[in-house]
Amino acid sequence: MQINGVKIKSGYDGKIISVIGAARSGISAARFLTYMGAIVTLSDSASEEKLGAERVAEARAVSAKFIPKATVDEALPENTKFVVTSPGVPKTAEVLQEAVRRGIKVWSEIEFAFHFTMAPIVATTGTNGKTTTTILIAELLESAGLTATIAGNVSADEIKLTLVDAAWNSSADHLNDEEIIVAEISSFQLEWVHKFAPCVAILTNITPDHLNRHASFEEYVETKARIFAAQQDDCLAIVNDDNEAAKNIADGWKERGYQGKLLRFSRNKVYDKSVPAAFVENGVITVRLEAGGENVAILPVSELPQSLPGNHSVENVLAASAAALFMGAKPEAIARGIREFKGVAHRMEWVAEHNGVAFINNSMCTNTAAAVSSLSAMTRPTVVIAGGV
């Protein structure tokens, strides 16, 4: 088949495929599977009323059989080749467990996207710092004259592109050789990955979170670690050496059988020349991509903009700088992109100052570790207005 004059070999023509979950990513996957010639069932356990009129209209606009309030058998038609599941559907869901029991392959939507994208993927996961790091990487690449598309689980208001959308665009449009997909990836999206191997994978940190979804903190950690599992030796894995859970993953790299080239980052350590790393040396953000390689100075920490306050921002900048350098950005372009970074809405967002009082919107701070990092970044007496349960 051809899209925009580009021949696409999908391998999905006439295949029966089930998409579980009629949320944004599920609808996106169903839409593109039908474009590829698959026979698609899009189902959700929720009723039309619970899904809402807008979501139902989007689902019905897809050339797939849409089944709200679906039973397991309705969601898994006979001869289903594989299942694509939305991140909002837990691993323990009866329909997914039944698919496994029947020997049907289950893919997350990012696994599906990876199978047909033609663009390299830079993927960031972690408990905190994902969105800022993702958007910062994209802006650093753009500063270097590269083309970056932000996609995935990004919670910024203006970014609604799923990884499937971005991957499809890279296949359907005559791909610019410099186009790069920069994606934020949640633990939910990593539950059903098998061959997903981003060109660069970043782990910002891991602290207890989402334990209503994951059976234990240990399971949550192992799910996050799956972002590295299929990487090959031409891929880069960037891991926070200052975070205990992330460091433990890095320390067990060979034992886990991981193939990706490991680069540790730390705001507290200066590394021996034998270690690929990103670190602060003499007050300067520094990256060394290769063991025994050159130390590349990016910019002094003192020159980080107001939009990147606190120690946690130094960590984000270290990771983003290493990723951008690996993808071909020059140090001076990276430094320029950092200086010009405007920040992300709802994350230590400077709103205004009145009568000497600064007002900062940090409403995306939803767990203890994020709250501690944010408050530690404050250099003036601080009053916190907090609420919610």
Language model features by range: what are they?
Residues 1-108, 112:
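N-terminal leader/targeting and accessory segments in enzymes
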Residues 4-16, 28-36, 300-389:
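Nucleotide phosphate-binding/pyrophosphate-handling subdomain across enzymes
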Residues 20, 43-45, 85-86, 151, ...:
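Thr-Gly-centered strand-to-loop micro-motif
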Residues 23, 46-48, 154, 242-243, ...:
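Residues in the short beta-alpha loop(s) of Rossmann-like NAD(P)-binding domains
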Residues 23-24, 90, 128-132, 314, ...:
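Residue-level detector of alpha-helix initiation sites
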Residues 34-35, 73-80, 87-241, 245-259, ...:
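Phosphate-binding loop of NTP-binding sites
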Residues 41-44, 67-70, 107-111, 152, ...:
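Beta-strand->loop->alpha-helix junctions that form or flank phosphate-binding loops
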Residues 137, 279-300, 344-352:
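Acidic-glycine-rich active-site phosphate/pyrophosphate-binding loop
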